[in-house]
Amino acid sequence: MINCKSCGQNIITAEPISDSCIRLRIADVGDKECGMSRYGIYEKLPTPEFSSEEKGEKTVITVKNARLEVGSDGSFTFSDASGKTLISSAGIEKQRGGFDARISYRDGAKIYGLGDATRRRIEKTGFATEIWVRNIRCYIPVSFIHSHDGWGLLLNSTWRHAVDIGASEKDIMRIVARGGAFDVYLFAAPDTHSMLFEYTRVIGRPIMLPKWAYGLSFVANQANDINATMNDCLNFRREDIPCDIIGLEPGWTANSRYHFGTDKEWNQKTYPVPGWQKGDKSATFLGAMERIHFHLSLWLCIEYDLSYEEERQAGYEVKPDEIIWDDDDYIHDSHFATAARLDGNTKLEEPFFEHLKKFVDDGAECFKLDGCHQIDDHPDRLWGNGMTDEEMHNLFPLIYAKQMSLGYRNHTGKRAMIYTSGGYTGIQKYAATWAGDTGGGAKPLSSMLNLGYAGHSNVSCDMETNCTAGIHFGFMQTWSQLSNWAYWNQPWFLEDELKESFRFYAKLRYRLAPYIYTMAHKAAQTGLPVMRAMSMEYPDMEKADDLGCQYMFGDDILTSAFVDEITLPDGKWINAWTGEKTDGGKTVAVCTSGVIGGPLYIKEGAIIPTTGDRTYLGTKAFEGVTFNVYPSENETSFTLYDDDGISYGYENGDFAEVKITAKKTGDKTVVTVMPRTGAFEGMSEKCIYTVKLYQNDIVGATVDGKAAEISAGDGWCNTGTGKTVSVTVEVKDSPVTIEFKA
């Protein structure tokens, strides 16, 4: 920390965080450290090269890509490396234990962020809101704001606060908090992709889920018992509908459907796991599920003080209640021996995850964190760490996800599939989320795209199955969930056309798994989400911020939901359903029929990896991969990613990649497949790939100069068009070049 010059009672400090980020903190003597800092939410980064100098009443801190000038009165100017002013403030007013900050930005700036603070818009100028976790209205607020102008601001606070982005005063962003210091991380980055990279480098990248979590998750009816749930498993297999996760809703625990504490046991009437079967999963229903390749998810609710465990992990002492007997106590009545706590659930010495280990040992691999009570206000509660709810409320769902994720990892050594409806800044590094009890329409889509602007990638919602549009959207998400909580949404109970649509899209998603998994890994490395708003990918596209129902699904697939038109960015695009190519820069009608519920357009030059039909993903390496090439006159490439699907070995380089390039020149299209690099346990010995070219005038092909057999056929998502030709090759130690000739 650099102590800056200060007049008055404020303490002004600055800290170089990275080459593109500087932290500024203006505090009173009594302001405590933010819970996010105290509890290790931020990544530990090496100190970058920086300079610091005093110029009169100002302190100037410079890192490679940014410069912060702070006045002794709390005024500041934040600039990029060229000296261009990005944002500035005439001063931060500390008041009533909190602060009132007025920050100027450039006229005409487009501003994004705040997570789930609104589901009505993407761009935020002229918008004001309170950053406070709420049921339905705001499940996952995020205190990060950034602009296409090249600046970003992360408020390091969990206190209830309000943000006004030019709604009350043009080109002025006002942040008012009821408590805590004005503590911000300021970022300088030239574009959104770079900004998300820098932001998630500081706060944490999106978690990489188990491979099977990117398949289909089915939440069973709460009235189910063991027989009904096992029948659901069998029906997915019998109906030839791929699925990987089966989730239990309230009712799986004994004594209470809504069990808020740590005394849970299996409900022996609905989901019996007899004591004599403990330690022998093969004899239980969980073993039977595993044998047909399902992973069990358990529903949880909570009313438990997680702050004690956070204090312990932060290195602070948490003293359990002591039993104290007085020598003069004749009766030794235990009611008087310890403190009388209003909280009857929390056990000071027991981390919340501790009681779940036995269920993990029995075979549970996934936990659904319901909103019930984690997102509720607790206005009269004093938490164990000394915080009131004004400071703890936003923090609670974040540390809940943290303790669940790290608890599972530490207990098993495997990746966690923890998904929750509640969250706060940094949620992406611990859990997947779904859009809460708001269905699967256009507003949940807006929520997902807004969360993408906060670097959160593993998003989903409850799939709508009453129309093909809802099914289309439900499967074109980072992860897919069908909730059957109190309904009869099983696909085999749908009308015939909807049932066929569900089966079609489920199989389509599973064929697309290598692409989705590669994009998920890209998110985990860069902070760039799988689902991307149009303005994130095409910031110069006219009215991109108004296109809230369409989005890029990874690098190369454009889709939309619940609208009759889709606007194509500049360039050429291929209709995935028909194979027809069209020019971009225009709006076209969305044509749906039969099982098709929405559009899919492929960017010219794309290389989409797919695999064959399968009933589950599991953790196995991708085999029989087809590279679907949509040739362009510009050379394009794709790097396929794969790993063991379940461990954290990828963090240490245990993964493999295959790069493929393609370019069309005149009547020739040249595709080169590079040798596989890297390794992981369980990967296939041979590298055999099919290269499928989406061009129907091909008459021949060579592989490394020798004539090769080609076969005509359909694409990965269309049938009956016959607009592709394929060549299968084995790649060993040298690149393989395929030349297609028209």
Region locations from a protein language model:
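Solvent-exposed beta-strand/loop surfaces of large extracellular or lumenal domains
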Residues: 34-50, 574-595, 702-726
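Beta-sheet entry/capping signal
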Residues: 21, 58-60, 67, 143-144, ...
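Catalytic and substrate-binding clefts that recognize carbohydrates or anionic sugar/phosphate headgroups
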Residues: 4-7, 15-16, 29, 51-211, ...
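Aromatic- and carboxylate-enriched substrate-binding clefts and catalytic-loop regions
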Residues: 29, 36-39, 242-506, 537-539, ...
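Short, well-ordered beta-strand segments enriched in hydrophobic/aromatic residues
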Residues: 14, 24-26, 61-65, 558-560, ...
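Catalytic core of carbohydrate-active enzymes
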Residues: 406-407, 413-416, 425-434, 452-455, ...
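Surface-exposed interaction regions enriched in Ser/Thr/Asp/Glu
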Residues: 728-742
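Conserved, mostly hydrophobic/aromatic
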Residues: 14, 144, 236, 404, ...
